[in-house]
Amino acid sequence: MKQPTAEQIQEWIDDAHDDIESQKRRLKEGFREKHNLTLEGFFWARGIYYFDIALGHAMLGDRPQAEEALTESIRYLALPYRMAYDEGCEHRDQAAPPEKNGTIGIPQTNSLLLAMAALDNDEINAELIPFVQLAESDEKDQEFMEMVQTIRALQVMLSRGEDSLSASILKTALDHSKSHPIKGAGWRRRTYTINLTLWSVLQRQQETFDEALNLFLKDYETESRGENRDLAFAYASLEAVGMIKLARRYGLKYEGDHPLIPAALL
């Protein structure tokens, strides 16, 4: 896939900064109250803007600015969880019910945890992981069971918990994938490759890790050729960066040079 130019990447960064400033103005003008919008939605959107900024700087090779923007992104994306579950959160009195605010669902939680893995900051993980959790109804969601298990495993791994627990969680997901065949591309196939990659990390299996990561990247690149091709995340995968960072904790290596993996964040 043709890579974006430096000018295009800088335009994405500038647009995201403009969106942040526009959002701040609307908040001051009472736009949220006028249209009965949740505060969580504004925090989540700002987190996505910083996410795009982080990807842009990473693609341009600017590690300090990429890490700074990724940190801001994670903190804003985590705010809806703090509003829901952290009694000490200053915005808790404005929180919508977790199952109604639309910002802490299963895919969002999965993406946030993988972004935290990409940042690889134990201090931030210790601060936020206790609150980055699913609503009870999502915990019991059988349709998305494989991704729920990904979330549970990542919570343990990022907290530096027991490897045996993470492995057991991932085995449950992988066994489910095998007994319920995956047909074609989509979230189930992507989740399977993530679970297989994380499993290989815990087992310290370098060859399986390489194969699973390559499968993930191949699928990611295929999906990026579609409607996402004009967006920053089509050209850089924080999920892949996060899995590589976790692999390094367990003594595994990544020696590739894939265009979807920005070296500035490794």
Residue ranges of each PLM-predicted region?
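Eukaryote-skewed repeat-based solenoidal scaffolds used as protein-protein interaction platforms
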Residues: 3-217
